[in-house]
Amino acid sequence: MSLKDILTLIAVTAALVAAEPSAFADKLEEIIQSGVIKIAVPADFPPFGSVGKDGQAEGYDVEVAKLVARDLGVKLELVAVTSPNRIAYLLTGKVDLVISSLGANPERAKVIAFTDAYAPFYLGIFGDAKTEVKSAADLAGKTIGVTRGTIEDAELTRLAPKTATIQRFEDNDPTLSALASGKVDLIATGSAAAGSLARKSPGKAEKKFVLRDSPAHIGVRKDEPDLVAWLNVFIHYHQKPGGELDALAQKWLGESLAGLPPF
C-alpha cells in the first residue's frame, strides 16, 4: 500500500466514523475524486512564499503545498494571497486550504479550523541596530510598521504605548521596504521575513524583542474534519527527523522541525 493510500485510508475512516449518515460526501473525497486541489500560498513573504527570478512561486509554503498534492495524488493549483485576504479566499471557496504561514488565535478559530503546526515561527519587533528598543515601553514615540490583519498587528495594537504610531501596510513587501528605507523606525513581523531582510540589508532588521511564539498552521474551513485529520497525519508523518517536511524546513527556514509543538 502506498503512502497516499495509507494517509487517505486513515483520514477517511476517521471521518466516516464521526459522520452523520447523510454526510458521506466529505471534502477529502471530493478533492481526490476531482483530481485537483487549490491551495493558497503567500506571494510576498519569503522564505515562506515569493516570486522567484524565473517568475515562478517559490518558498517553504509552496513546497509544502506541492508535497500535499503529491501525497493526495492530485493536480496542484497555487493561488497567491496576501495576509489580509488569505482567510477570505478560504471562506469564499476560492481555495481548499491555506498554507501561508498562518498563525492560530481564538478570533480566527471562530471562523476556520487549524491543523497541527507545520513550521516554527515567532513574531517580534525588529529595527536598525542603532535603534535602542528592548521592550514594549520603549516603543513610545516610535513609528512601527506592520502588515494589516496579521497576528503581529493585533499584538502590536495591544502592547504599543499610546504615543507610538502604528503604520499599517496591505502586504509584507511594503512593510519590509518601509524599514529598509527608513520610513518607519521599527516593524512588527515574523522571524523569517525579518531574517530575509537582514540578509539583504545587514544591520537593518535586528531583533529587539519577541511579541509571541506563533508556529504556522494550515487553515481549513470548519466542518471538514476529514481533511484536517488527513493533513495532521501528513504533517506528523513527514516532520520526523529525516522526513521531507523536516528537510524543507532546514532548506528554507534554517531550522529543524524536531520538538515543534502541535499548537
Residue ranges with predicted function:
Residues 85, 101-110, 155-158, 180-212:
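A ligand-binding cleft/hinge motif common to bilobed small-molecule-binding domains
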Residues 27, 151-168, 202-207, 235-263:
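Ligand-binding clefts/hinges and TM-proximal coupling segments of bilobed small-molecule sensing domains
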Residues 62-71, 137, 142-143, 149-151, ...:
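Extended ligand-binding regions for polar small-molecule ligands
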Residues 38-47, 57-71, 124-170, 186, ...:
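Bilobed "Venus flytrap"/periplasmic-binding protein-like clamshell domains
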Residues 77-88, 167-177, 181, 214:
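Short helix-initiation/N-cap motifs at beta->coil->alpha
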Residues 8-19:
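Bacterial N-terminal signal peptides
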Residues 43, 119-127, 195-235, 255-263:
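Periplasmic-binding protein-like
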Residues 25-101:
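Extracytoplasmic small-molecule ligand-binding "clamshell" domains
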